């Protein structure tokens, strides 16, 4: 029998604000170009995706505002905390993303960074539409209503 490779023991870095600030339409997985100290920092969960977004420049995609803390044992060879990092995508994927961003006014947002097969760092990019303030309020009201219903059901089941 063929053994499956174990999944990574590392939990992914997730951009929790992305779902709140954007209406996410489609997702795409991309590789990322990193230095050795950046990979080691990510294994220690020292990254921050909160304000990260992707830009397309000259047919290449770059991840901006992705903060990776300097590696504690990096010494002189450490990396800068915030810098544009190149994403690895096929040309057709880049062209498709570029069309969506130009035509529909959509935004490329980084939603997740994770290790695939415990070896390669991957970034999940979402194509999203920015939400307006009233959309955010509506989402919060729906979420609160769902929580109230769940609490009511839980308390009614408790006394039966």
From Swiss-Prot:
<dbReference type="GO" id="GO:0005829">
    <property type="term" value="C:cytosol"/>
</dbReference>
<comment type="function">
    <text>Required for rescue of stalled ribosomes mediated by trans-translation. Binds to transfer-messenger RNA (tmRNA), required for stable association of tmRNA with ribosomes. tmRNA and SmpB together mimic tRNA shape, replacing the anticodon stem-loop with SmpB. tmRNA is encoded by the ssrA gene; the 2 termini fold to resemble tRNA(Ala) and it encodes a 'tag peptide', a short internal open reading frame. During trans-translation Ala-aminoacylated tmRNA acts like a tRNA, entering the A-site of stalled ribosomes, displacing the stalled mRNA.</text>
</comment>
<dbReference type="InterPro" id="IPR000037">
    <property type="entry name" value="SsrA-bd_prot"/>
</dbReference>
<keyword id="KW-0963">Cytoplasm</keyword>
<dbReference type="GO" id="GO:0070929">
    <property type="term" value="P:trans-translation"/>
</dbReference>
<keyword id="KW-0694">RNA-binding</keyword>
<dbReference type="InterPro" id="IPR023620">
    <property type="entry name" value="SmpB"/>
</dbReference>
<dbReference type="GO" id="GO:0003723">
    <property type="term" value="F:RNA binding"/>
</dbReference>
<comment type="similarity">
    <text>Belongs to the SmpB family.</text>
</comment>
<dbReference type="Pfam" id="PF01668">
    <property type="entry name" value="SmpB"/>
</dbReference>
<protein>
    <recommendedName>
        <fullName>SsrA-binding protein</fullName>
    </recommendedName>
</protein>
<dbReference type="InterPro" id="IPR020081">
    <property type="entry name" value="SsrA-bd_prot_CS"/>
</dbReference>
């Amino acid at each position: 029998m063929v053994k499956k490779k174990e999944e990574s023991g590392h939990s992914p870095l997730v951009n929790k604000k992305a779902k709140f600030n954007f209406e996410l339409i489609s997702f795409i997985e991309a590789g990322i170009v990193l230095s050795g100290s950046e990979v080691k920092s990510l294994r220690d969960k020292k990254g921050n995706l909160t304000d990260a977004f992707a830009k397309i420049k000259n047919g290449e995609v770059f991840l901006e505002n992705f903060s990776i803390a300097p590696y504690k044992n990096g010494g002189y060879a450490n990396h800068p905390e915030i810098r544009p990092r190149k994403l690895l995508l096929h040309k057709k994927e880049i062209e498709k993303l570029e069309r969506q961003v130009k035509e529909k006014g959509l935004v490329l947002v980084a939603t997740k960074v994770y290790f695939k097969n415990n070896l390669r760092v991957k970034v999940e990019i979402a194509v999203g539409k920015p939400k307006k303030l009233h959309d955010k309020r509506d989402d919060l009201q729906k979420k609160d209503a769902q929580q109230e219903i769940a609490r009511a059901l839980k308390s009614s089941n408790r006394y039966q």
